[in-house]
Amino acid sequence: MTRKLFWRTRKKSPSARNLISLALDDVRSILNSADIAKEWAACAPRLSELCQIEDGKTGGVNPGDRRALFYLVRAFRPARMLEIGTHVGASTLHIVAALMRGAWEQIPRLVTVDIEDVNDSPHSCWRQVGLAKSPKQMVEELNARVEITFVTDDSRHFFATTKETFDFIFLDGDHAHETAYEDIVNSLEVINKNGLIVLHDYFPGGRPLWSDGPGLCGPFTAAEKVRATGVATKVIPLGSLPWPTKLGSHVTSLALITKSR
């Protein structure tokens, strides 16, 4: 049924018309921003206190990627943001920290979706891996002036039923290439003008980025399939960050989906 819903709600061919157009130099300028670095330095101690999630132990986004997300969200200042794949809340917390900084005409909104109940179930991942706080508890302790909605649903059904649109979408859900493809296509339908899509676990060519395991093919294959169907997208892998990520490297699996022309 959910697959039928997905196809029924697609009213037209996917288009990159609403995506922002960026170059790698634009992204590097953001990641090397002195102003955002000052904001990061001001909030990083509190984030480390709340987000006591050891890298490599929970499957959560690594510390360097969390910082990169903070920088990207601060730079693009989305009023409405979507995250697919809450998991233990590492990325969620850093997104909220970025959203809460700055002057807003309206309260910014984050919708974060996961197929599991990430907060209250006895089987929630944060409990299973021995963390002290749920994603909801972590973000509540920030006292952020941000509207946050946790949704327990699979991404296909969420996209098929949501009436919302978003300025910035972070995709870190099911990495099977079919689901990742559908997530990208569905994101294109709900992205606002000059919007941005960010992928996690994007391994160019499906090749390993680190020595601790094989590369993941799903997000890369999905993004290539979108382009192969004629959608004018461009993927910008962030490659190496100005700060450490994991295993003593600066390498990241984050990548941006932008308009190619």
Predicted region positions:
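Membrane-proximal basic amphipathic "stem/tether" segments
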Residues: M1-R46, S260
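Class I SAM-dependent transferase core
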Residues: A34-P63, Y71-A75
